[in-house]
Amino acid sequence: MTQPTRIYKHSSAGTDWAALLLGAGLGLTLALQLTTVRKSDFTSFYASLASFSRLSALVGTYLAIVGIFLVARIPWVERGVGHDRLVTWHRNLGPWSLYGIGAHVFFIVLSFAGQDSIPLYKELWLSLIHI
């Protein structure tokens, strides 16, 4: 005879802790970027664009890592929040991580094209062949 399946009740405390940890991690990620900013990062429009690009890369990558963590089937996380809620969060978070990483690619290519004073399509081609 098989053992009965355990049913866990998910409290809002687990959700609150998850949101707190997510926010703290994002805050730490942004703080790491902001502590490395130099005055030279804002000397021109294209330098500022490169700084914004790095920021969007950090946020997008952080959200991608959180998305992987959400569906990693970690028992204590599933007991605290619930698998159905974690999958919903993963589904809602996925596009935003891709938008952040895509914005990074777009803005860094635009920044390099402006700094090198070459057309955008040439910089995009140079970026693609040097990967």
Task: Set out the residue ranges of the language-model regions.
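Hydrophobic alpha-helical membrane-insertion segments
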Residues: 92-107
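N-terminal membrane topogenic signal
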Residues: 7-22
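Membrane-helix interface/capping segments
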Residues: 68-84
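Membrane-interface helix termini and inter-helical loops of multi-pass transporters
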Residues: 38-47, 115-127
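Conserved small/polar residues in nucleotide/adenosyl-binding loops
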Residues: 129-131
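Membrane-interface segments at loop-to-transmembrane junctions
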Residues: 81-93
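Alpha-helical transmembrane segments of multi-pass membrane proteins
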Residues: 25-39, 70, 105-108
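Hydrophobic cores of alpha-helical transmembrane segments in multi-pass inner/ER membrane proteins
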Residues: 57-71, 96-100
